[in-house]
Amino acid sequence: MEYKNTLLMPKTEFPMRGNLPKREPAMQEKWAEMNIYEKVQEHTKGRPLFVLHDGPPYANGDIHMGHALNKVLKDFIVRYKSMTGFCAPYVPGWDTHGLPIEQALTNKGVKRKEMTVAEFRKLCAEYAYEQVERQREQFKRLGVRADWDNPYITLEPAYEAQQIKVFGDMAKKGYIYKGQKPVYWSPTSESALAEAEIEYQDKKSASIYVAFPVKDGKNVLEGDEKYIIWTTTPWTLPANLGISVHPELEYAIVKVNDEKYIIASELFETVAKTLEWENAEVVKTVKGSELEYTVAKHPFYDRDSLVMLGDHVTTDAGTGCVHTAPGHGEDDFVVGKKYGLEVLCPVDDKGVLTEEAPGFEGLFYDKANKPITEKLEEVGALLKLTFITHSYPHDWRTKKPIIFRATAQWFASIEAFRKELLEAVAETKWVPAWGETRLHNMVRDRGDWCISRQRAWGVPIPVFYAENGDPIITDETINHVADLFREHGSNVWFEREAKDLLPEGFTHPGSPNGEFRKETDIMDVWFDSGSSHQAVLEERDDLQRPADLYLEGSDQYRGWFNSSLSTAVAVTGKAPYKGVLSHGFVLDGEGRKMSKSIGNIVVPKKIMDQLGGDILRLWVSSVDYQSDVRISDDILKQVAEVYRKIRNTFRFLLGNLDDFKPSENTVAVAELREVDRYMLVKLNDLITKVKEAYETYDFAAVYHAIHNFCTIDLSSFYLDFAKDILYIEGANHEDRRAIQTVLYDVLVALTKLVTPILPHTADEVWPYIPGVTEESVQLTDMPEAVQLDDAEALKTKWDAFMTLRDDVLKALEVARNEKVIGKSLNASITLYPTAEMKTMLESINEDLKQLFIVSEYKLGGMMEEAPADAPKYEHTAVVVAQATGETCERCWVVSETIGKDAEHETLCERCATVVKENYVK
């Protein structure tokens, strides 16, 4: 008889190798065929809503690791919520207007100057849709479950119409105004930029100290002094109209040789050192407030420079006397306005100096620094020129420096509802908690929001102008434009004359001849995406405002979190979200930013093609995403190893349940052995821990809990000793069916617990599980932890056993290394435990040699009675010897009962009985 044929070895069709790059696309096709998104929505209909609102990625180019991290985190949450009593719709979105798309077309050779704005915009829309399609397929490949057929896209007519409504509502409340004001201006984009569109990079600049002679000392100064200002932007000096000093600071009149200079007293030493003064002495001090309205002379133009008071003046750097050009700085503008200065801005859209800067007209601002400095030297006003490298704002798209420039722009008045904004921030739940402080400070400190852009590709600002120049924004015009956009899209604004965009018969007192013109600026793209709470959450039947959660990268505190908050509070008085969760950036394995120049860019597509989407998703679950995270081939290799462990666990469980019918073979909990019930306690602990971790968005805790359960609780303990019973006993042996009962519960629970993270693998496992009826694991709920009556007692006892078992395993390892035994089944062990452990061991009814995976187990005396040479551990001394007897051909146990049964002389007594009862006819 071939005894190996009498062993119940694992049997399953579930493949050992994942082969995810091939298998996942097939699974996704299956999901598409069964309409999994709709099925889940149908299955969860009527439950409370949980809305995670998707912040729209920009529709340009392939998705990068930041996109992958973001969408996968969202998918974890949505999938988990739909398995825990919620209906969790997920509507993906795309941000589709803005400069990058214009640039992409220009780079493709589109000659925009040879076509109308409307024609160019049509090409922009086509390009945007292509990009949406490209990114949609890549997001789907990640396994993200969403309403992919009905996303929201900011260029769609219905969306644009709602955005116009948001603008109109804000205008109606008086929050929208037109003003001349310095804004971030990008000469390379020829447009104003929002704060969210700038980034800081190092830049080399001229650092100059300039003397402004006093013209009128107002009886405070004698008239022969000179104010010293410091600037790193010499090109703004043609726009200088004043000097700001701090009212509370003390200023010193310093005599150096025959000259007298005015600087802040506390900067005396620094300035003296910088300007290499020798024999400098302070001849007089005055308070800043006394210098108000004194007048200096512009160094190279025949005009005055008024001395004004400003709280923005600091002693961090410079001289305490600040060069003030209202056309080129926020603080300068505010101070200048207070003192009635004009807003002089002699720089055009392209960054070129105009005729208002005589002697320098026609020069690009950056190229004007040198001739201006030379002019200062020529007139004797230049005291010092050096070069410094400092952090300077750049256009985030063109990567070129930007300037502050006063232009006529449309603004949303943040000041008008700042208090409500701050209240909304306080009412929101922030994860991490520092997010609240970050947004609070931004809202507290930010100026009014410049919402106009001088570009073509965007949503037009729906304003008309009367013949007398009055802007027209009324309910009637707003509703009419919104209706036109809903029907024709916003291109209609560029295709029709102003009169054809106004309601029929529209009149206005400022236009006696019935003539109107329309605004040509478009809205900041942050106004587009910032209106999604109205255009998507409020408008779609399957969603609601406020959303439960917004989840984006930490750069969105100044971006989408901020713009959405501003428009929502302005329109509804409330935040558009109940909670905000942010994640960090993806860095390479060494913690460096990914960049083409370093060549360290990791692309999601490559990972999915080589390893699979579930490996990428498992990586997302493994990292502390609230900070910056790292990815590299080595890191992915470790994650792939963990995946292999999880997959092998599934395969082992399935293989040993091949002959298990839950309806017939399940053993009641009360009839299970203690060790089996202990395993159920461990499973329930896992369920509780994993669900708590999902609830708090702590996916790394889910990852570690599942990995540890598979390796420590299952592989190293339960499954390890269970093999002897599963393979060796007869199919219906009560211990075997008891273990299978536990394995079945473990398998079903584990499959559900990993579903949000590993949906492809979970749905691959699901149909192999005996007795399941649902088409997909996604149509089930998370497992419930079942509290066993004796759970605490079981835990106390068996946790103690596990620590003692660790001691035994160490002793067996030593014996193996010393060649006392080959494998652990060759061993006979005698334990000399502590009193506590002895009591515990004596209370165990299970076969201890099976639990220790040895052939013979004996309980000796107490620990102190152990032989002197026996290795002693924390809980027991262990004597390991070679077991006596022969090795059974069938179960490999060493036994003295081999050959007792004449018909089966190579088998031990136990195996002979099993074979006779189950396999001998």
Curated annotation (Swiss-Prot):
Bound cofactor: record note: Binds 1 zinc ion per subunit.
Main localization of the protein described in the UniProt heading: cytoplasm
GO molecular function per UniProt: aminoacyl-tRNA deacylase activity; ATP binding; isoleucine-tRNA ligase activity; tRNA binding; zinc ion binding
Pfam families: Anticodon_1, tRNA-synt_1, zf-FPG_IleRS
A Gene Ontology biological process term: isoleucyl-tRNA aminoacylation
Binding site for L-isoleucyl-5'-AMP: 552
Enzyme Commission number, as recorded: 6.1.1.5
Domain of life, per lineage: Bacteria
Cofactor(s) listed in the protein's UniProt record: Zn(2+)
UniProt binding sites for Zn(2+): 888, 891, 908, 911
Renumbered ranges of motif 'KMSKS' region: 593-597
Span of the annotated motif 'HIGH' region: 57-67
Residues given in the record as ATP binding sites: 596
Catalytic activity from the UniProt record: tRNA(Ile) + L-isoleucine + ATP = L-isoleucyl-tRNA(Ile) + AMP + diphosphate
Keywords: Aminoacyl-tRNA synthetase, ATP-binding, Cytoplasm, Ligase, Metal-binding, Nucleotide-binding, Protein biosynthesis, Zinc
Alphabetical list of InterPro entries matching this protein: aa-tRNA-synth_I_CS, aa-tRNA-synth_Ia, Anticodon_Ile_BEm, Ile-tRNA-ligase, Ile-tRNA-ligase_type1, Ile-tRNA_ligase, M/V/L/I-tRNA-synth_anticd-bd, Rossmann-like_a/b/a_fold
SUPFAM superfamilies: Anticodon-binding domain of a subclass of class I aminoacyl-tRNA synthetases, Nucleotidylyl transferase, ValRS/IleRS/LeuRS editing domain
Subcellular location: Cytoplasm
Its job: Catalyzes the attachment of isoleucine to tRNA(Ile). As IleRS can inadvertently accommodate and process structurally similar amino acids such as valine, to avoid such errors it has two additional distinct tRNA(Ile)-dependent editing activities. One activity is designated as 'pretransfer' editing and involves the hydrolysis of activated Val-AMP. The other activity is designated 'posttransfer' editing and involves deacylation of mischarged Val-tRNA(Ile).
The family this protein is said to belong to: Belongs to the class-I aminoacyl-tRNA synthetase family. IleS type 1 subfamily.
Domain comment, as recorded: IleRS has two distinct active sites: one for aminoacylation and one for editing. The misactivated valine is translocated from the active site to the editing site, which sterically excludes the correctly activated isoleucine. The single editing site contains two valyl binding pockets, one specific for each substrate (Val-AMP or Val-tRNA(Ile)).
Assembly mode: Monomer.
Identification of the protein by name: Isoleucine--tRNA ligase
Organism field: Bacillus cereus (strain 03BB102)
Gene name of this polypeptide: ileS
